[in-house]
Amino acid sequence: VCSSDLANQWNNYRQSRLISEYESVVKDESRKGTINYEKEWERANAYNQSLLPSILPDSFAIAAASDKPGEEYMSCLNILTDEMMGYVEVPKINIKIPIFHTTSEEVLSKGAGHLEGSSLPVGGENTHSVISAHRGLPSASLFTDLDQLEDGDHFLIRVLDQTLCYEVDQIHIVEPENTSDLAVEPGQDLVTLLTCTPYAVNTKRLLVRGHRVPYEEETIEKEEKESPMSLYTNYLLWVVVGLAVTAVLIISLWQYDKRYKRKRKEKQAAAGGAPKDASDRKEEER
């Protein structure tokens, strides 16, 4: 249990670092000349428009099996050139997870993946973006608590220099091959968060859909909370840090004592071989 919680904390830390790096790049005034946000939005919107002939893209199955996603797709929203397009934040369950291109196993082991073939998460009419993440991994929490969301809750998609807010309006559990709930709906701006269910069984898919609403900080703040699991894992992290610091101190004191005794013996030898005390003899026997 301790090792899995520690791995979970490490992954949370790594995700936080990625998100912090992303935010620093977005907010860095000196980079505004090198990153044309308007152009990035235009490219992403053009990509989404290209998907519209197929309201329910057949490319879902193809994308899931493909090891070589399209170059145009991979280049969209890739301002850090690390395949991270933004991050999803769910205040009610206290998570912030990087969103990467594709839903490959490598991607899903470290964060959330955007389902290629669905709309890129930039909002707009006639769009339906699908964000997928694992649930119940021993090394990462990810979408483990997604089943706690209810109609009326909110989640955020932070991409480039924009924050898009979505209100949950539909929660379905479906068979893996059933993609009808992922269809684009005319005139709608939708995002679905997708994960496996039941917990640790994973034979079905949990789909939490939201429609775009105005972003109001007061509403989001009301939903924020620190869950008991977060308190537990944070406490555990401090326990582990405390044990590590204690171990370092013990090793440092042992090394200092060893060096002190060695220097004392050297001084005794230089002084003509003064008799060794019991502690010196014991040290030599070691």
Model-predicted regions and their roles:
Residues 1-233, 257-268:
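Solvent-exposed, non-transmembrane regions of membrane-associated and secreted proteins
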Residues 244-259:
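Alpha-helical transmembrane segments
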Residues 261-286:
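Cytoplasmic C-terminal tails of single-pass
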